[in-house]
A protein has these predicted regions:
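Extended beta-strand/beta-hairpin segments
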Residues: 1-47, 58-138
C-alpha cells in the first residue's frame, strides 16, 4: 500500500498538511525562527509510536475480554546533541488503572504482540534505536 504526505509551506518555519480530514500545522520555536504555531516535527514520531502501540494494546485486550477503564501510553526518549539530532532510544511506559480487574499476564501478552507483531511504527524505529517498555499500575 502506497502512502503519501504533502506539506505546504506557510512562511517562516511553518508547514501545514491535511490528514484524514484533519488540518495539522507544524512549526519551529521562536528561538530558531518559528512562531510556535504548532508542534515541532520530531515529537510526532513519539506520538506515532504511542498511538500505534496504544491502539494495538487496547484492541488486543478488548478481544481478550479485558475491561479497561483507564489507560495511558507515554514515550520517553533522549535526543542526541550532535547533528543530525535524533532520538537515540525509546522507552514506552504503559499505565493502567490498578483497581481494574485486569489479568496482568494478558496485559503483558498484548504488549508483546504489539511490539513484536503489530506496531509498524515500533518496527521501523527498532531498526535505528532501542525500543524498551515497562508496565505501571497506578
Amino acid at each position: 500500500m502506497k502512502a503519501e504526505v504533502e506539506c505546504r509551506w506557510n512562511g517562516g518555519m511553518s508547514f501545514e498538511t491535511e490528514m484524514d480530514g484533519h488540518k495539522i500545522v507544524i512549526d519551529a520555536t521562536p528561538e530558531v525562527g518559528g512562531k510556535g504555531l504548532g508542534p515541532r516535527p520530531k515529537p510526532f514520531m513519539l506520538l506515532a509510536l504511542a498511538g500505534c502501540t496504544g491502539m494495538d494494546v487496547i484492541s488486543i485486550l478488548n478481544k481478550m475480554g479485558q475491561k479497561v477503564s483507564w489507560f495511558n501510553v507515554r514515550v520517553e526518549s533522549e535526543m542526541t546533541e550532535e547533528h543530525p539530532k535524533h532520538y537515540s532510544s525509546y522507552h514506552i511506559v504503559y499505565e493502567f488503572k490498578a483497581s481494574d480487574d485486569l489479568n496482568r499476564k494478558k496485559v503483558d501478552k498484548a504488549i508483546v504482540l504489539s511490539q513484536d507483531r503489530y506496531c509498524g511504527v515500533s518496527e521501523v524505529l527498532k531498526k535505528a534505536s532501542p525500543v524498551t517498555h515497562q508496565v505501571d499500575y497506578i
